[in-house]
Structure formats: C-alpha cells, structure tokens
Amino acid sequence: AGVYSSDIFLRQLKKLGEGLGLGTAARIDLFEKLPVPFGLVRYGVAPDHPSIKFIASALEKTLDNPDIHLYCDVEFGKDVTLDELLERYDAVLFATGAVEDKPLGLPGADLDGVYGAAKFVEWYDGYPTGAREWPLEAEEVAVIGGGNVAMDVARELMRNADDLKERTDIPDNVYEGVKANKARVLHLFIRRGVAQAKFSVQELREMEKLPGVQLIINEDDFDLDEDTIEEAGKDKLTRQMVEELFTIREMAEDMEDDGDVDYEGNTADRKYYVHFNSAPVEVLGEDGKVVGIRVEKTETSADGKMSRTGEFEEYPVQAVYHAIGYKPATAPGIAYDERHAHLANANGDGRITTTASAEDGAQVRERLYATGWAKRGPVGLIGSTKSDALLIVTNMLEDLSKAAEGGRVAADRDPESIDRLLESRGVKPIDFAGWKKVDAFERAEGAKEGREHKKVIDPEQMRALAHA
C-alpha cells in the first residue's frame, strides 16, 4: 500500500501540482520495519501463487524512482517517533497493514493445537521474525474460514512438498516441514452457504487441482433456492464463484465415483472435505490438546443472514487453524478504532483522527493519513488498495495545497536530516540498492536448484547481504 501510494502521489503531483500551488516535484521517504520491502506481496501471498508475486516486479519499478528513498529496517516508534517525522515531512502516511490474527473466540481456543492463520502464513512464507519450525504431526486437521486465506492454509496443508518446492521460493526449513507433514484428512468449515463464500475463482481452481488429494463436497449444500440464485447473479464475481463451485462439485462427485483418486484419476492418499453452512462452536480437547471440533449446521438466506439449526456434529481432528480475519497493527501515538479494526480516520477518507468516532469528539489531525488495511481494516485485495491510494492522495494534495497557503509545513527542510537522526541512534537503514543485493542472492540460490528464487529468511543474513 505504501509503494502504490507513493507512485500515485508522484503521478498526481505532476498532473495537478502546478494548479494546486505545490509544484510538480517531491521527495518521498518510505520506511519499512522489516529488512526488505513489499510486505503482503512477499509475506502474505501463499508460496504457490508466484504469479501474484510478480507484482513485486512492478513495485520495484516504483522504488527505482529517484524521488523515492527506501528505508528498510527502520521501526516507527522505536527508531523514529511521530514528532520527529512531523518535524521533517509535510505529511506522514501510515500503510502498516495487518499481521495479527483476530481471536477465535470459541471454547477450547487456547488448547495446544489451535493456530491462527497469520502465524502459519509467517512460517511458510519465511517471515523474518516468524517461526522456523512448525508442528505438522496431526493426521486430521480442521480449517475455519470462508475466504482466500482459509483456502491458502488448507491448500498448503494438503500440498505435496516436492511439488511445492519445484514451483515456489520456499526455503529449506519449510520444504522439510511440509515433507514431514502427516495430515491425511482436512475439513474446511465455512459458516455460510455456497453463495456467500468469499473465495476467488483462482483459489477455487487451485483447490480442485491438488495432486494426490480427493476433494469431497456435500451435494446438499448446493440445493440453492431461486432467491439465493437470483441474488448471487447480481454480482459478477459472486456469480462466477458460484458457477465455479458447481463445476467443482461435479468434479468431486466423479472423484468419489472412481474411488480414492485425485482430479487426474491418480491414487489419492489425502482427503479434503469442504463443509458449507457449518459453524464451529467448540474445539474439543483432552489433556490440554485438541482431539476434535464441534460444529453446528446453519442455514443461510438469500440476503446472507445466517441462522442456527441446533443440529451438531463432531469431527476428530488434532489441529485447528482459524482464518477468520486479520487485525491491523496499531501505531504509537495514533488512535485505533477497535470496533472496525483499523487506525482511526475520518469517515474512511484516510485522514487520521484524534479518536475513533465522532461521538467521542474525533478531530482530524493535520498531516497524518492512513491507507490500505491500516485505513479500512483487513478487507479487499490489491485493487482495493489502489483505489484507497488514489483517494488518500487526492485528499493529501488538497490538504497540502491549503497548508502551503497557510505556511503549515515541516520545519526541517533538510532532506539529509533523517539520515543524521538515524545514524546518531546507530540505525543502519537498508536502501533500494541493498534490497537488490538480497534479491540477487535469492535469485542465485534459486538458480542452483532450478528455481527462480530461494527466499532468505534470516534477518541478520539479509542485513549482511544488503550492507556488503
């Protein structure tokens, strides 16, 4: 989100800057907590989605702009404060994303064997401060969630290790972990019905084509009434998703008819059950460990409202993964909207406010903005992030124009002031040239194994490479 916003800001400034009295040139300093850039694209996309990761190439072109200066390995609130930024910059934009799981909130959620999707994603994507080993001892696994992250988690738990290594940038520790994975049965539980799922068509097509995996879907879940079908048809993406699900259901029936086989008719040693209208109500445990999950059947009306039926089923599982949403990060000195899970901003326009709501007397804080998931919460994909960026940039330019008229701009105009401040604290930022050194090393390591990349996961190794 930060890179998109930087690119759009410079483009819009060239187009509108003269008319706004701002000129057409600007310097943007982009701060990143991690030693390398690209956030969600590098550390939030499933490793078997390399096509999406090609977005990083487009982002690199933006970072190669001489008007954008990258400062990786710099932590806001620790290495530099809000007041210090406001002293040096005319505007500060938060694009801090979301890295924490929303709590599961079910009885048994604290049992050994219950995992949030965010931590699992950190492991398989090689997040610099993430786990290096992951317990994959469970033979029967449950995944809770009706969106793309749940689908990613389920797919990675069912994926063959050699297949994953061949087509991705996973590091050795992830390959060895997946290779030792004992999961043979997976249950994906989705609270609402077929027409209310939030899967992309791409995710669905990847689900159906897992080598060695038999897909099993309850045909009763596809008995949709006319109102539901009509409602689903109003939205193009929903209609396409539902059509794809019906196609997958037919394919799953063929798998069952042919015995234990995958989509190509080859022997399947793993089973992947998809349960719609199934709301988990309790994680069952013995001696502090997961032994099962209790699920209540639900009914979903055409307008998406869910009702409970009072009918329960229990499934034996030894691990439960929940992908029910992320919680955007807080930022020191910035109010947080707990209800909507994002940084407090005025009516969704990206202008940071003093408190979360107008009822609390929220006032806009000059020169402070939020974009992406930090602004709107953990919803929407890259297209939404681009739309956000344009909205926020438009507001920023309008505000900067007014600020310039009133003389309300940063006091310290020296572009090297931030470098001196960080140096005085012993902070050694990694710039774009440093990132390119890390990237070159990853490409070289990947080439040794016939892959495009092999990801570096040790932050100290990243720093050594970048500063060499």
Where are these regions (language model features)?
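Glycine-rich dinucleotide-binding loop and its adjacent helix/turn
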Residues: 101-180, 342-358
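Short hydrophobic core segments
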Residues: 88-97, 142-144, 315-325
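Feature captures the FAD/FMN-dependent oxidoreductase FAD-binding
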Residues: 12, 58-114, 273, 281-294
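Dinucleotide-binding/catalytic capping subdomain of oxidoreductase cores
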Residues: 16-33, 37, 41-43, 151, ...
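C-terminal, flexible cofactor-proximal segment of oxidoreductases
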Residues: 353-468
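N-terminal Rossmann-like dinucleotide/flavin-binding domain of flavoprotein oxidoreductases
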Residues: 25-27, 35-91, 248-266
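Core beta-strand elements of the Rossmann-like FAD/NAD(P) dinucleotide-binding domain
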Residues: 84-91, 136-138, 307-318
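FAD-site-proximal beta/loop scaffold in flavoenzymes
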Residues: 113-131, 283, 289, 301-376
